[in-house]
A protein has these predicted regions:
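Conserved glycine-rich Rossmann-like NAD(P)H-binding loop of the short-chain dehydrogenase/reductase
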Residues: 89-105
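Canonical Rossmann dinucleotide-binding motif of NAD(H)/NADP(H)-dependent dehydrogenases/reductases
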Residues: 54-94
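Active-site helix of classical SDR
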Residues: 182, 218
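Substrate-binding pocket helix/loop in short-chain dehydrogenase/reductase
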Residues: 158-159, 163-168
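SDR active-site lid
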Residues: 232-293
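Residue(s) in the substrate-gating loop at a strand-loop-helix junction
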Residues: 202
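Conserved amphipathic alpha-helix within the SDR
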Residues: 111, 118-121, 127-142
Length: 334
């Protein structure tokens, strides 16, 4: 029986002595399953009612004042805007980027506004670099309260025209780096049963797109990783550690060239950062930007696959085929 149902039994004002009553085992098992199904139906109703209620009375945002917040890829784009906005909310920022000049520029802006920032040059594609810099963060700043895995890279083009080293680098930065940073900073969160992991993924990690095969695959991976991690934390009874996955559409960070789309607009990094922070501080599990895309994603699952493909063509979601694999570096992020 589910834990909530057990607690209901334990705290109920009605007590029956059934110690002398025994059902045959097959019937008892079926009764148990039936009761669990009843509980699930009531819990489903409760969840819907709560969602409707929250449309009228939104969840209050939690405070990050004095919290230590680490942002990877903080020198540019979404990472920079996330760092600036978190600082304005009172957070202590730990900035990682491979580009020292860009990282220092972000820190300077934070300090000019009266905030606190620590900067570290780190190539998140290299495990040894992550381990070295993580140790330094523990010594200089302390335990990280909020880990923002944002650094990303994109090499667009036809799959067979993308260089092998570019595919490997895409996964090293967009996917594997998330595992390595988690292995460094999650243990201290587990000890305290407190923390927040924010994963910057992409809508390309919810719906595959032509000429973004490697990129889409890397973002699908981190979406699944964060979802699985959330389930693992729940099973470990570490519900004080929250996870949020951010899935923006095309963002003007300099990564995506020749984007196409008949509807909507290219998002600015600041728009994405504001939506991401608002969702994370309300402990939302998934934040899609713009919010209107959530309806399309939910409804899209109800349609046949061929129709969904035709719908993508109608909307024009993706990048143009003339976008060839280009030289990119991970100081540009999604």
């Amino acid at each position: 029986v589910y834990p909530e149902f057990k607690r209901l039994q334990a705290t109920s004002c009605l007590h029956f002595d059934l110690s002398h009553f025994r059902l045959p085992l097959p019937i008892a098992v079926e009764m148990n399953i039936f009761l669990e199904l009843i509980y699930l139906l009531f819990f489903l109703l409760y969840c819907y009612l709560e969602s409707i209620f929250r449309l009228v009375v939104p969840v209050k945002r939690k405070s990050v004042k004095g919290k230590i917040i680490l942002v990877t890829g903080a020198g540019h784009g979404i990472g920079k805007e996330l760092a600036l906005e978190f600082s304005r909310l009172g957070g202590i920022l730990v900035l990682w980027d491979i580009n020292k000049a860009n990282n220092d520029a972000t820190a300077d802006e934070i300090r000019e506004e009266g905030g606190t920032a620590y900067t570290y040059v780190c190539d998140v594609s290299k495990l040894d670099d992550i381990k070295r810099v993580s140790d330094q963060v523990y010594r200089d700043v302390g335990n990280v309260d909020i880990l923002v895995n944002n650094a990303g890279i994109l090499h667009g083009g036809e799959l067979l025209k993308i260089k092998e080293e570019d595919i490997r680098r895409t996964f090293d930065i967009n996917t594997m780096a998330h595992f390595w940073t988690l292995r460094e900073f999650l243990p201290s969160m587990l000890e305290r049963n407190e923390g927040h992991i924010i994963t910057v993924a992409s809508m390309a990690g919810k719906a595959g797109s032509a000429y973004l095969v490697d990129y889409s695959a890397s973002k699908f991976a981190v979406f699944g990783m964060t979802e699985a991690l959330s389930e693992e934390l729940h099973h470990l009874h570490k519900d004080g550690i929250k996870t949020t996955t951010v899935c923006p559409m095309f963002v003007d960070t300099g990564l995506t060239k020749y984007p196409q789309g008949r509807f909507g607009k290219i998002l600015s990094p600041k728009e994405v950062a504001l939506e991401a922070i608002d969702g994370a501080l309300k402990d939302h599990v998934v934040v899609m930007v713009p919010r209107s895309i959530q309806v399309s994603v939910v409804l899209g699952q109800l349609f046949p696959y061929r129709f969904r493909r035709r719908l993508k063509e109608f909307v024009g979601f993706g990048i143009l085929p003339q976008y060839e694999s280009s030289k990119s570096s991970d100081n540009k992020h999604t």
